[in-house]
């Protein structure tokens, strides 16, 4: 039996991988500690998607090596995306590490730390999120060939998890107290196509909706061949959030072709119009990339105009990262870093104005909020239109109400900022 400190870096997909590992290891008697200094093994689940993530993973690994050198821990293992890309290089540069494991080597990781992999525990997880919400990873890998992305190299081909397995996993999460279920994958749009020849996403959402989760949220949809019946389900099912996260990346036809996105500007605009016509209450989140190779000032202005006209409810923007394992690495990274950052800032300044205007529409209204955190007489939570960690936060005064994390409360919104709603609790449930 060992005391293990697990550091899980990167995206929610990595979080689920770490949660599965913890459940397997705990079944073998392993104990997970809150702090590295209380452990004899450090295990780091790394991210290798973009340069910033790689640098964070390297920094945390070096910090763990120092603890081993100082004899504060006995062993250090590194797993996940970074070893999937750079196992040999990492092993050469960091001989102090006791083992490197890729993204599909869970049994090997468990064996290294003295635990046993058990097939019957495949659906079990120990949550790293607060106990009232969880992520359900419905597929692994990606078949898209977006030129800027190294995920197919890291995670492999797209493999949908069988519906019955997902329903078993979801049932266990519901029994444990999860009230909000967030469906994730690299691409949820094509869920089930490798199993049935067509998307099974809507069928899965309907079956999960019948399981009495209070909220079901869809994240990371791909715009090409998105199953539109899901939008109808959002409108018709009270516990399916009127919310869709659909990264679009750009609107310039030339850049979309170079990115190999499979959709042009006309198709993108028509898709958004169709989604909003079928469900006027839906809130759309998207992600853009600024500074893609060859992006001209005119193409960036086209992106700005598109965002201004479309008025997304939530939007993130990232500077293009020139990744050596992506197809776009053969292109010249010719937009200088300063210009990339300037373009990100300009786009986010525009979105801030849009977000402020949209948030003002909530002022004076009563809404339902899922409570994430309580500090003294203040509540921090989210509406159905806000995903964990990335979207708006509701900041509420509790008044005389006994509000606790995981509860739903009714709130009256009295003020707003671009990324927060402020108000007071007026009821529970």
Swiss-Prot record:
Its cofactor is [4Fe-4S] cluster. Binds 2 [4Fe-4S] clusters. One cluster is coordinated with 3 cysteines and an exchangeable S-adenosyl-L-methionine. [4Fe-4S] cluster 1 binds at residues 11, 47, 81. Belongs to the methylthiotransferase family. RimO subfamily. It is found in: Cytoplasm. Its main location: cytoplasm. Transmembrane segments: none annotated. GO terms for biological process: tRNA modification. Its EC number is 2.8.4.4. Pfam families: Radical_SAM (PF04055), TRAM_2 (PF18693), UPF0004 (PF00919). It comes from the Bacteria. [4Fe-4S] cluster 2 binds at residues 142, 146, 149. SMART domains: Elp3 (SM00729). GO terms for cellular component: cytosol. PROSITE patterns: MTTASE_N, MTTASE_RADICAL, RADICAL_SAM, TRAM. Keywords: 4Fe-4S, Cytoplasm, Iron, Iron-sulfur, Metal-binding, S-adenosyl-L-methionine, Transferase. Residues 128-357 form the Radical SAM core domain. It comes from Chlorobium limicola (strain DSM 245 / NBRC 103803 / 6330). Residues 2-118 form the MTTase N-terminal domain. InterPro entries: Elp3/MiaA/NifB-like_rSAM, Methylthiotransferase, Methylthiotransferase_CS, Methylthiotransferase_N, Methylthiotransferase_N_sf, NA-bd_OB-fold, Ribosomal_uS12_MeSTrfase_RimO, rSAM. It catalyses: L-aspartate(89)-[ribosomal protein uS12]-hydrogen + (sulfur carrier)-SH + AH2 + 2 S-adenosyl-L-methionine = 3-methylsulfanyl-L-aspartate(89)-[ribosomal protein uS12]-hydrogen + (sulfur carrier)-H + 5'-deoxyadenosine + L-methionine + A + S-adenosyl-L-homocysteine + 2 H(+). This is Ribosomal protein uS12 methylthiotransferase RimO.
């Amino acid at each position: 039996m060992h005391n293990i400190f697990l550091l899980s870096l990167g995206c929610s997909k990595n979080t689920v991988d770490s949660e599965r590992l913890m459940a397997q290891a705990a079944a073998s008697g392993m104990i997970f500690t809150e702090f590295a200094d209380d452990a004899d093994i450090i295990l780091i689940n790394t991210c290798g998607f973009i340069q910033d993530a790689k640098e964070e993973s390297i920094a945390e690994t070096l910090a763990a090596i120092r603890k081993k050198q100082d004899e504060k821990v006995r062993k250090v293992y590194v797993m996940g995306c970074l070893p999937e890309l750079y196992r040999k290089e990492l092993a050469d540069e960091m001989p102090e590490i006791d083992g490197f494991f890729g993204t599909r080597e869970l049994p090997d990781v468990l064996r290294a730390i003295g635990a046993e992999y058990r097939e019957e525990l495949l659906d079990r997880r120990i949550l790293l999120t607060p106990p009232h919400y969880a992520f359900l990873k419905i597929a692994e890998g990606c078949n898209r060939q977006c030129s800027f992305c190294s995920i197919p190299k890291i995670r492999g081909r797209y493999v949908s998890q069988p519906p019955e397995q997902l329903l078993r996993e979801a049932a266990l999460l519901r029994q444990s107290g999860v009230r909000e279920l967030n469906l994730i994958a690299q691409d949820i749009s094509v869920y089930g196509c490798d199993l049935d020849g067509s998307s099974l996403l809507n069928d899965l959402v309907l079956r999960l909706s019948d399981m009495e989760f209070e909220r079901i949220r869809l994240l990371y949809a791909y715009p090409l061949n998105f199953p539109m019946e899901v939008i109808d389900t959002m409108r018709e099912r009270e516990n399916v959030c009127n919310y869709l996260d659909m990264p679009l990346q750009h609107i310039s036809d030339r850049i979309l072709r170079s990115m190999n996105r499979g959709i042009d500007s006309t198709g993108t605009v028509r898709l958004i119009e169709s989604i909003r016509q079928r469900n006027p209450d839906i809130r759309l989140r998207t992600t853009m990339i600024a500074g893609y190779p060859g992006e001209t000032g005119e193409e960036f202005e086209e992106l700005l105009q598109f965002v201004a006209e479309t008025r997304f409810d939530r939007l993130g923007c990232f500077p293009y990262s020139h990744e050596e394992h992506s197809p776009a690495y053969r292109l010249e990274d010719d937009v200088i870093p300063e210009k990339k950052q300037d373009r990100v800032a300009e786009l986010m300044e525009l979105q801030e104005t849009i977000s402020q205007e949209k948030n003002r529409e909530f002022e004076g209204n009563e809404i339902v909020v899922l409570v994430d955190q309580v500090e003294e007489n203040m509540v921090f939570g989210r509406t159905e239109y806000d995903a964990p960690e990335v979207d708006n936060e509701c900041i509420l005064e509790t008044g005389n109400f006994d509000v606790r994390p995981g509860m739903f409360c009714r709130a009256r919104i009295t003020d707003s900022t671009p990324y927060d709603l402020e108000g007071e609790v007026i009821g529970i449930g």
